[in-house]
Amino acid sequence: MLKKKTEQLNLYKLPNDIEIYHTGYSTSIVKEKLARNLKILQEEIALSGEQSWHLGFLCDCYFGLEDYKKTIEYAQKAIKSGVKLIGQENNIYSRLISAMAYLNMDEEALLKEINNAILKFPELPDFYMDKAMVLLKQKKYVEAEVNLENVLDKYRDKKTE
């Protein structure tokens, strides 16, 4: 039974009377949360130094706050550190690739990071799609088509798992 500190908490089941509809968070709320999280991380780092587990969280905060240079810096640090972020391993690579694209960085450097992501996560369709988009931009249509076919194959494979 749930209790308040000083009294019993009454719970009611009202399935036909109440409907809760969560619409997500507005951009301003998300940015506020990211700024708050970044501040907490920075305070933690000031107290005990930067640890490898901070890197992915810093990368994520900076990406959401649209500081793409810092996103790249912390994504690269996280990758180099070898930190394991359970359930989010590919997120660091996604943030890195997206940040590089947003900053219109050199396409060959971008392709290098995309290829690294593909080597690390060959089962994921996302990075093949990223590669196809860069190749299309470079007018390398045959190579882009191969990668787009890989995307479709990977999605089909996921559906049959």
What are the functions of these language-model segments?
Residues L34, Y68, D106-E108, Y141:
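TPR-repeat structural position
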Residues G49, V83, G87, P122-E123, ...:
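Short coil turns that delineate tetratricopeptide repeat
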Residues W53, G87-N91, D126:
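Start-of-helix register in tetratricopeptide repeats
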Residues L58, L96-S98, K131:
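Structural register within alpha-helical repeat arrays
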Residues L65, L103-M105, Q138:
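Structural motif corresponding to the intra-repeat A-B loop/turn of tetratricopeptide repeats
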